[in-house]
Amino acid sequence: MMKRENFPVAKIYVPIERRKTLVQARVDEIAASMLKDGQQVPIKVRPDGERFVLIEGLHRLEAAKALGEATVVGYRVDARKH
């Protein structure tokens, strides 16, 4: 079972191809939900040296950034590089 962790937002890298899928309206919806209920669904990241690479949860990560959060809840996963 994966364990929830707090990851520093500043240490999470989002691959360029992934950034192209960002929909600002969705970020705004999630940010509003996070303000009301907190972060409900963790993101997924994989370790990459001193940083982490985002695997899943782009809109949740961007919502946390928009709210000025220093950390985001997530799972550390072992994933292959593409």
Where do the PLM segments sit?
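Short, charged/polar connector segments at secondary-structure boundaries
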Residues: 1-78
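Short, charged recognition helix plus adjacent turn
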Residues: 81-82
